[in-house]
UniProtKB/Swiss-Prot annotation:
Transmembrane segments: none annotated. Keywords: Cytoplasm, Methyltransferase, rRNA processing, S-adenosyl-L-methionine, Transferase. S-adenosyl-L-methionine binds at G33, G34, H35, D53, F79, D100, Q107. The keyword DNA damage does not apply. This is Ribosomal RNA small subunit methyltransferase H. InterPro entries: RsmH (IPR002903), SAM-dep_MeTrfase_MraW_recog (IPR023397), SAM-dependent_MTases_sf (IPR029063). Pfam families: Methyltransf_5 (PF01795). SUPFAM superfamilies: Putative methyltransferase TM0872, insert domain, S-adenosyl-L-methionine-dependent methyltransferases. GO terms for cellular component: cytoplasm. It is found in: Cytoplasm. Its main location: cytoplasm. One of its GO terms (biological process) is rRNA base methylation. It comes from Clostridium botulinum (strain Hall / ATCC 3502 / NCTC 13319 / Type A). Specifically methylates the N4 position of cytidine in position 1402 (C1402) of 16S rRNA. The gene is rsmH.
Length: 309
């Protein structure tokens, strides 16, 4: 299948980077290269773009899309490792970094990847198919209490306890091998009247995907490391697609903007923790009505931006 992905909040994200034509920029989630191409259009031959993705299909697609540009470095890795990636490339500081945390349209539409609850496929959900842990491992090997906590914390699923119990009961008969089997278990666990609120499997699939790819653990460290690698006035722009991610970005930005831990009664700061960033977006930027109509997957997107000081 051709790698297709419509970049969300494209114009807003590029504008937020305040691109310098001879600057160095990092696209932490290269995908099909949509954001990267717009960055490259604004760079001179002295500028440079580093494109990172853990999905080899994404890198292959991006190389084709960006074949007319010579100032691109492709890295097959997880942006969790941005610090060591830049170290290996002998790059000290950069002028801008973007992260688009959404699952690509290709990954959702390619049934064999197991991300979609709309298509029957093997339970996989790995962004990086070289990793060992898959959705199959989570569903068939995790204890009931572990499953419950994942569904509750990562999926904010109100029926997490019941779904976890149904999964464990079903797998005692035979291993649960496909997304279709998992969807049926979820349907049986959630009362019919609550299944009118969108697809019943949406929250569970989100939770399992986050667990498989360690998405939330990765995000906190990646934000800190990214800010440390920015030049003065460099920008970090992050697009999230669900409340858990957005909350992490919001809280981490606030911590980096106002890190002082001194009691309010202290007349001056004595903790020595100085602000690292200035938050550009006091409220997140959301897609326009037109973009939401054109690309339904953009509806939950939020863009938050900060500037290194």
């Amino acid at each position: 299948m051709e790698f297709k992905h419509i970049s969300v909040l494209l114009e807003e994200t590029i504008d937020s980077l305040n691109i310098k034509e001879d600057g160095v920029y990092v696209d932490c989630t290269l995908g099909g290269g949509g954001h990267s191409k717009e960055i490259l259009k604004k760079l001179s031959h002295k500028g440079k773009l580093i494109g990172i993705d853990q999905d080899t299909s994404a890198i292959k697609a991006a190389k084709e899309r960006l074949k007319d540009y010579e100032n691109v470095i492709y890295v097959h890795n997880n942006f969790y490792n941005i610090d060591s990636i830049l170290e290996e490339l002998d790059i000290d500081k950069v002028d801008g970094i973007i992260m688009d945390l959404g699952v690509s349209s290709y990954q959702l539409d390619e049934a064999s990847r197991g991300f979609s609850y709309m298509k029957d496929a093997p339970l996989d959900m790995r962004m990086n198919r070289e990793e060992n842990l898959s959705a199959y491992g989570v569903i068939n090997n995790y204890e009931e209490e572990e499953l419950f906590k994942i569904l509750k914390n990562y999926g904010e699923e109100k029926f997490s306890r019941k779904i976890a119990r149904f999964i464990v009961e079903k797998r005692t008969e035979n291993p649960i091998e496909t997304t279709g089997e998992l969807v049926e278990i979820i349907r049986k666990a959630i009362p019919a009247k609550f299944q009118r609120e969108g697809h019943p499997a949406k929250r569970t699939f989100q939770a399992i995907r986050i667990e498989v790819n360690k998405e939330l653990q990765i995000l906190n460290k990646a934000i800190e490391d990214s800010v440390n690698r920015l030049n003065k006035d460099g920008r970090l722009s992050i697009i999230t697609f669900h409340s858990l991610e957005d909350r992490i970005v919001k809280v981490k930005f606030k911590e980096l903007e106002k890190p002082c831990t001194c009691p309010p009664s202290f007349p001056i700061c004595v903790c020595g923790k100085e602000p690292q960033i200035k938050i550009i977006t006091k409220k997140p930027i959301e897609p326009s009505k037109e973009e939401k109509e054109i690309n339904s997957r953009s509806r939950s997107a939020k863009l938050r931006v900060c500037r290194k000081i």
